[in-house]
Regions:
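Cytoplasmic juxtamembrane interface segments
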Residues: 44-71
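Hydrophobic alpha-helical membrane-insertion segments
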Residues: 69-87
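Juxtamembrane non-transmembrane "cap" segments at the membrane-aqueous interface
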Residues: 82-102
């Protein structure tokens, strides 16, 4: 059974984000908000890799590449959120999330699920932004007259 390129690249996004956050946690930098923004690089890499694989396979239609890019990014986001939920409960559940949320845009004391749902919406929004940016980039590269 062949695994789809979207799942392969979505899993690469998940692995990159997971290793990055585990490394930040081990180094004691998990509370530095600005370092968390670098996870966008892993999403950009995975989505760009899917689009490049499509182009290599001869798929140059914008809509098909958009679907592939969105699937790739959403798989990475969903796997990352599931990993965050598991990791949060292993680290103490709500108490761990409350230590993270001190530097995040939450009011009050969010639970693991509240935190995860908010990050899910943020991830879906970033999926749309990353997909559109890369599609515009590749569309300009592939235009032939």
């Amino acid at each position: 059974m062949k695994i789809s390129k979207e799942f392969q690249n979505g899993f690469l996004i998940f692995l990159g984000i997971a290793i990055y956050f585990l490394l930040m946690n081990l180094l004691g930098l998990s509370d530095v908000f600005y370092l968390r923004l670098f996870n966008t690089l892993f999403v950009l890499y995975g989505v760009n890799r899917s689009i490049m694989m499509n182009i290599h396979d001869g798929e140059v239609f914008l809509v098909n590449n958009a679907k592939s890019a969105m699937k790739t990014s959403l798989i990475g986001v969903f796997l990352s959120i599931i990993g965050l939920i598991v990791f949060s409960y292993l680290q103490g559940g709500d108490q761990y999330v409350q230590s993270l949320s001190k530097t995040f845009l939450f009011g009050g004391n969010p639970s693991v699920m509240t935190y995860s749902i908010c990050l899910l919406f943020e991830g879906i929004a970033s999926t749309v932004v990353v997909t559109m940016l890369l599609l515009l980039y590749w569309n300009n590269r592939l235009v032939t007259d």
